Amino acid sequence: MTRNTQILSEKELFEKTKGIVEHAINAEINLTFKRGDNFCQYHPTSENKDLNKKVYTINIATPAVKGINKYTALLHELGHVLYKSPFTPIKKLLGTSKNYSFYFLIFNVLEDQRIESHLSENYIAYRQRFEKTCTALGKELEDQITFDPLYALLAIRFNQEEKVKDAKNFLHYKKALEDVKNTDEFGALRVFLSIKKY
């Protein structure tokens, strides 16, 4: 069923959806619509006036990232807030690692899988949204001759297993994406540590 935009505009829909999450977990979420990527950023309590309220910024890429519907992007980023993505612990874990960016991207793939599994289970209509998005993003993955762990995880997550089925450690990466589903807030951290050696 198509939403009547004369009754509820896109902006109102986004604000109301954001408001539900804010109320559910006592958070303040600043919603921005800027160029670039969709993201969720946590602002530590030391920077906040109200120590009982967690503060986040969520950006919804405008124009939209190819293959990602803007409302689906909002639901995904709100999932990071709702399912308590461990922003501070992963930064502490990685510390000053020379591979910080690479490791963080791998962790993020696992964390995205974790939060979307919860959203898909608790809000059944979202499953189709996320599957459609993953498939669209998979079609955008360029073929590679060699497979690093990040590419392998993305290909599996985006329904493009055939591209990496012969990759070294394929089975470990596939298992990791299964193991992280429906885990607690530290599930992606634990799974990340279990595959770091690969």
Identify the meaning behind each predicted range.
Residues 1-198:
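Short, functionally important secondary-structure microenvironments
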